[in-house]
Amino acid sequence: MQRNRWGRWFAGVAVISLVVIGCAKSSGATTPPAASTGAASSGPAASGGAAPAGSATAAAATCKGDGSKGEVKLMINQWVGAAANVAVAQCLLQQMGYKVTTSTLAEEVAWQGFQTGEVDVILENWGHPDLEKKYIQTDKLAQDAGPNGVTGIIGWYVPGWMIDKYPDLADWHNLNKYADLFKTSESGDKGQFLGSDPTFVQYDEALIANLHLNFKDVFSGSEAATITAFQQADKNKTALIGYFYDPQWLQSEIKLVQIHLPAYTPGCDADLKKVACDYPPYVLNKIVRTKWLDGAGDAGTFVKNFKWANADQNSVADAITNKNMSPEDAAKQWIDANPTKWAAWMP
């Protein structure tokens, strides 16, 4: 965040703060284990059918519970899709009788919470092999709790109007040809490549260097600031290239086109200093604290079973971002509309 010098950063912090407050409304956010350094097209999720019987209430009239079954500490990643995951899980866990507390943390910082006991569950992990090796394989402090059902795509994107005007821009070989279009006061005599939150999974600086591109990586500082930049570039027909991903509700609001980088092959990103290939597709998974899982009971079973599709996450994220709904209300709306989906998560 500290590297960002854009005025839009302040708006991004405000958006993220609202998401945090909404998600923590029922039980309050926990103190972070360390100082923090700071989701596909949206649409209605498929309706389920008759409300099932189960450990949670049949309808989400309220997300309240008595907290008698113990505490679950959920981590919220710094993007709205992750807030959608937590909002739905929090509501259902509270209905099951658990007290749920939440923390909003940078990805790497969150893993430290497995050691301190301040984080029990990460519901969306975007591939951190170094952290997985340390906390899962070596220290045995955490475990893989299976996929969350969402497939993540990271890449380089430009507004659709640019491809309409410059069709060959979609091929990375031609990026230097158009570098001057992307120059800003931040990038000097090079084209600007807009990075996002510096804590996200990314190796754009290495890609730029290893592909010999005349660009400079400039961080926006947050997801919210990146979204604003793409919205303005689409509206004002200004040039922009940057790091973005799917699932993310913005993909349905404006046309974004992914740049064709050298194709990903297994192992091409083994040395991130030498990487010269596209990002891999990510089968997003859940990570849980081992000591918590050992005594988690029904909550542990629920977390292992938690699995929904990109469209489900997008519908909740869209409601939070574009329909002025609190995370809790957006979660209740999805829960009411999809009883057969969340029933499959119940012990």
Q: Where does each model-flagged region fall?
A:
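Bacterial lipoprotein signal-peptidase II cleavage site
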Residues: C23-P32, A40, A46
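Extracytoplasmic "Venus flytrap"
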Residues: A56-A87, A106-E108
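Pocket-flanking alpha-helical
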Residues: G65, V86, L105-L141, I227-Q231, ...
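Short, well-ordered beta-strand elements
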Residues: G67-G81, Y98-S103, K190-L194, V303
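Short helix-initiation/N-cap motifs at beta->coil->alpha
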Residues: N77-V80, Y98-G113, V218-A229
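Ligand-binding pocket segment of bilobal, Venus flytrap-like solute-binding proteins
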Residues: V119-L123, Q192-C268
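A conserved helix-loop-strand patch within extracytoplasmic ligand-binding domains
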Residues: L141-F193
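A bilobed periplasmic-binding-protein/Venus flytrap-type ligand-binding module shared by bacterial periplasmic
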Residues: I154-K165, P281-G295, D318-A319
